[in-house]
Amino acid sequence: MSLLIDFIDETEEVKEEYVNLIREILGKAAQMEKIEDGAELSVTFVDNERIREINRDYRDKDQPTDVISFAMEEMGEGEMEIVGAEMPRMLGDLIISIPRAKEQAEEYGHSFDRELGFLALHGFLHLLGYDHMTEEDEKEMFGRQKEILEAFGLGR
């Protein structure tokens, strides 16, 4: 299964190996979640100040976070679904703070690769509708994350 992923690096510090890691882990997740070929998403790498601005402007949270997901398939109030058109499935946008990912990798005592893969996967699952607002939803989402990370070889 192939995803079309548009990568945007606003930090100018993301190595090609990290882009490839994310492409591969999200490809594995898409395969395990049975996402159709040609589905699209974007992944943008930012600094803490930029992710803080996005949080403040769109989520009313004036602080940096590690990853933000904007799902295209979530219908907002007053929005209408476009049906019948032969268009690729647009999953949405992931925004990852590179400095925050580095901080958390150190904090949790694992590699930057593992943290970056985890954050990309976590955000991707949000794009697919997974959430962790209730205990039951959290158990389902975190269980699925663990399965995919282990299948990919990035388990703890």
Curated annotation (Swiss-Prot):
Its cofactor is Zn(2+). PANTHER family: ENDORIBONUCLEASE YBEY, CHLOROPLASTIC. GO terms for cellular component: cytoplasm. It comes from Bacillus cereus (strain ATCC 10987 / NRS 248). Belongs to the endoribonuclease YbeY family. GO terms for molecular function: metalloendopeptidase activity; RNA endonuclease activity; zinc ion binding. InterPro entries: MetalPrtase_cat_dom_sf_prd, YbeY, YbeY_CS. Single strand-specific metallo-endoribonuclease involved in late-stage 70S ribosome quality control and in maturation of the 3' terminus of the 16S rRNA. Its EC number is 3.1.-.-. SUPFAM superfamilies: Metalloproteases ('zincins'), catalytic domain. Its main location: cytoplasm. NCBIfam families: rRNA maturation RNase YbeY. GO terms for biological process: rRNA processing. This is Endoribonuclease YbeY. Keywords: Cytoplasm, Endonuclease, Hydrolase, Metal-binding, Nuclease, Ribosome biogenesis, rRNA processing, Zinc. Zn(2+) binds at H122, H126, H132. It is found in: Cytoplasm. Binds 1 zinc ion. It is an enzyme of class 3 (hydrolase).
